[in-house]
Amino acid sequence: NQGTSVVENLIIIPNSDEVTSINLNIDKSIYLGNALICKNTNIKYTATATYPVRVQSKEASIIIDRCTISGLLFGSGFAMPEVKDEASIGYFGMTDTNIKVENTGTNLYLVTNMNCNELRFENNIVYYSGVPEATSNVENFKVFQGPSYSVNKLTLTSNTFIDIESGYSNGKTSAIVYPSKIGDITVNKNIYYFTYREYPAFLIRVASAEKSKVTIAENNYAYLFETGLTLNVFQNKIGDTSVGFTSNDVDLYDTTDPATFNKSTGTFIPKEGYTQYGAQR
């Protein structure tokens, strides 16, 4: 519970053989001055409003590694600027982490409305733990939301998204990463999977496509469920690059086998032939 006091550096890492993980319950926003680093930490947000992290500085660093995250709220998310245009992120790295979304709603953003020099989102699982249907599903989820803000370098690799919609109501299409531009894009070995889907869905969308560059975009897999809705890696053409999923019609999981597809444990292991894609656990 930090209240409105500024924390310059918050570092949470187990440092003994006896303690292999730490439970971090956040019931008020952390006003971040410089760096947040969490490793092997079970992060649970227990407040009833706003974001867990409010960034107050330019070029702040956020590093989340081998963690679990739960309790994030719709209408907010994980990190936001305390004052618009007076905060930015130098490095945002989330790796080997599970994000469990237990409720349904619209607009859940991990990072919103800040420039980000480098965004690395790698080997993570993001999943809705319930059973999606027309009246209850996860809509407009974003790793990065900021069509007026830029990401200079994006690495989006080896992630698994389960029943997480990037689109939302009224036919509005969007993407899991949506900045104004991305200077350099690597998007590789991701799995985007639905047991139910209502809207078109994409991994990446940019507001200024001509100012973005694709370095690697390959080996991304998706499954559409039983719909004809569009699902693509890029919502719009980026430079001369228009890339779809390597496959979007192969059912990648045996959803009847709790040893390989289990929302209660966060276990998602693809069928043989596809185990090298998505998050590795």
Regions found by a protein language model. Name each.
Residues N34, G77-A79, F92-T97, G167-S169, ...:
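Non-transmembrane, interaction-prone segments in cytosolic or luminal domains
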Residues A207-R281:
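Acidic, glycine- and Ser/Thr-rich low-complexity intrinsically disordered tracts
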Residues T4-N15, T20, G33-Y45, K58-L72, ...:
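Right-handed parallel beta-helix
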Residues N9, N23, E118, K153-T155, ...:
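Acidic/proline-rich low-complexity IDRs
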